[in-house]
Every structure is written in structure tokens, then in C-alpha cells.
Amino acid sequence: DITDLPGGNYNLVIEVRNKKNELIAQKKVFIQRANTGAINSWENIKMINTSGTFTDAYSEEQLNYFLDSIKPVATESDRNLIESLSARVEPYMKKKFLYNFWVERDPNDPYKKWLQYLERVKEVNKSFGTPSRAGYKTDRGRVYLQYGQPYDIVSSVNEPGAYPYEIWYYTTLPDRQTNIGFAFYEPSMVSNDYILMHSNARGELHDERWKVKLYENVASPSEMLDFDNTEVEDKIGGYRAIDMYEF
């Protein structure tokens, strides 16, 4: 697997050896590799030319913010590299990474793609931000940026016995998963920072007992102590947002 091999010139050497490790035959082939995959090494980043690109106008403070804000849509290897782009790294390296990040997503117009994403970051900051956290750093902000706008959002703020919560439902995710839900709740009941408690999306937090946690203030001892139990009886008989979608 040469996915992570930096671009450059190489000699591919094939050798045939006997049981005594004596060379019987050898063939050498020159290859030139242009790595158009993920930029995941310092060597690859250094090769990027950002002269005359949209990154020219950004200060180091802006670059630090922008790199942090793209984490929700970055691959794991990209996120690891972003973490390593600390304050000690020269700003030009951060520019190279940011520019290539969007070139990989839209080679024809990376600036347009970047501006579209930046608008979404502004949206989640406005909708989900708190006095202490930018919206893109919250669970709802991250999910919105990663998967897009939900097909439906069911919000419950004053449901008896339950913490404030929201159900986000997606008919289809970008990777073609279907009928996906996300459950967020706000256990402190004093902020706008809703925490992800359950989802059926691959790679996301999955808790079969999320409803028990949501209604723990009114759940019976048997419902709480039975660790195979995933439901809490509706003792009031009113509307419950959790009943809108099963996931």
C-alpha cells in the first residue's frame, strides 16, 4: 500500500533470491509518483505552493481558528496533522495545509468550497454556540458540519420528567447510510450546549439505554437497575418527541 508515500521519483527493485539469500535475478524500474491523496506528512505539505491563493491574506490567528474549525469535516489523519500544526509551526505551513485541504475537496474552485464551509461555520456558531464554546466545537455543531442539515429536528424543552433534548433525523447521510438519528440532551438545563447521547450512525456514540438516561429523574428503580432495559414507561401519557423516530 503506497497511499501515504510522498510524491517524487523512485526505483522499484524486484529481486529473486534462493534459500541461501543469494541474488539470482534483479529488475529495476523507474517510477514517478504524484501523490494526490491526503496530505498527511510534513514532506508533502512543504511541496504545496500557496503563492497567490486565498490563504495569502490570513494572519496566524485566523489560520489557527480556521484549522480548528475544519476538524468536523477532516479525516482522522488530517485531524492528527492539524493537532501537530501548533503555535511553534510557521504560518506558511498552516497556509499550505489549509489550501490543500480545500483543493482536495474541489480542485476547480477550492476558494468557493472554503467560503461555503465558512458560512456553515458561522451558522452553527450562531445557532449552537455558548458563552464559553464556539458552535463548531459543540456536538450539534460538529454533527451539522459533518453530515449537513437534518431532514427533521424534533425539540423538547419542557417535557415532564425529561431533560431538554433534541432528535435529529436524516433520511440519508453523505456516505449513503439511511434512516439515521441523533439524540442530544442538556442535563445541566441552563445552557445551549446539548450533548450527543446516542446515534445509529456508524462511528458515532451508540447507547442502547439513552432513553433511560434521558428520563432518569422519573424512571423506576427496576427500569434503572435492569441493564438490559432500554425503555422508560410513559407515566403521563402525553406527547414524547422520542416516539417520533426509532433509531
Go through each PLM region and give its residues:
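Short, exposed coil/turn segments at beta-strand boundaries within extracellular/luminal domains
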Residues: 20-25
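Residue-level signal for short segments within beta-strands and strand-turn junctions
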Residues: 16-18, 186
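A short tyrosine-centered beta-strand micro-motif
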Residues: 1, 8-16
